[in-house]
């Protein structure tokens, strides 16, 4: 299976194998480099840093070596990994823009915006963004039902277990956390949205995906309306009409 199809089909087994080959410390290097496990610096109090586990972390906290089997869970974002929606939105924006990490703010525009860069190859960015585009826009993609007309929405769903399958069966519950993160357009993205729906029985694409889709659609609807209004205001004044304009629809004249 190719990387593209693994992203489009959301194939956990593919990424189990990738995680096994990389090892936990390399996963932690890329995860931390893209902002996981650290505060984003958004203008909100008590921001949680989340957790990107590593061998030094487990030795410091639990005083034992890292178990290789845990790498498999971390490779698909489970196990000890914890993230916030704003971290995922920031990470997705960084990947889509070639590695530029933006500090988020609660305002329309920041002329002095601070950024940092994490090195990502052009080939890596292209392959990942093509995969994320396929998730929404290729038949068989796990979020094909979220595609939008004339908008290149790219995205990825995620479904996080809240407990083991055995515990869930004992308690008679299958509730999960449903995630979706999306950006648009595919080239030079200008909006990124991350959503989580907690304690749901639906997967991320069904639970959180429509939230992201609707926000992106509303953004473009408002943007297009503003552009249309600007074009109308800037249009030259029309010359006065000197004779009446007559339109006939379905009328027979004698």
PLM feature spans:
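Beta-lactam-recognizing serine transpeptidase/beta-lactamase-like catalytic domain environment
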Residues: 1-197, 243-254
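Noncatalytic linker/hinge segments flanking ATPase motor cores
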Residues: 17, 23, 170, 197, ...
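Short, gly/Ser/Thr-rich active-site loops of penicillin-recognizing serine hydrolases
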Residues: 112-116, 129, 206, 210-254
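Short alpha-helix boundary/capping segments
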Residues: 120, 173, 200-211
